[in-house]
Amino acid sequence: MAMEDREVMEARGAGESCPTLSKVAPVDSMPEGKPKASLDAEVPKLELPTLEENGICEDRDCPGPPRSLPPKSGPNAKGQAGDGPGLESVELPLPLETEHRNAMELEKVRMEFELTLLKYLHQENERQRQHEEVMEQLQQQQQQQQALPHQFSGSLQDLLLPQNQFAMFFYCFIFIHIIYVAKETVFFLFSKHYLFCLAAILLCLIKTLWS
């Protein structure tokens, strides 16, 4: 019994830094029928967990009660634990990338629409400019055509207007001579071809009344 007490005390002295979870049963509570060999076998069994716990406490310098080691996380556990954040980190960029792609496509469509609109506006402006040029050319041609008769009539009027007294006397002589010739011609026609003259006069009257 003294030997057992000594071993228990040694075990307690080794584990002073951390209290042990398992307590050794008192010697008086042991059954009397157990042999000494069985008692010697039980004492080392009790010492092993206390030594392991003391080693854990000495390594970690924990003044409190012994803490159980965390379970080793294998690759499966690590993968399961990382499934949540991994999925979130993979799923979150997808909508952002899709939204960015949609925004780029919308911007591209808008730019194409603006380019097409500018193209049609340029074509319309060019067509309007050509139409205005053609209309200006037509107006110039009409003005030139209208100006030619005025110029000719003006030049003819300038030509017919007498520049001096001699020209006016010459015009009067020509006018009197034309009147005299016309009178002689009419008298000659009536005297020689009165039937023809009457027929011509009747035709002119009928045409005037008919119209």
Swiss-Prot record:
Localization per record: Membrane
Protein name: Transmembrane protein 247
S-S bonds: none
Cited InterPro entries: TMEM247
Keyword Ribosomal protein: no
Source superkingdom: Eukaryota
Biased composition regions of type Pro residues, renumbered to the chain: 63-73
Biased composition (Basic and acidic residues): 1-10, 31-45
Keyword RNA-binding: no
Membrane topology: Multi-pass membrane protein
Organism: Mus musculus
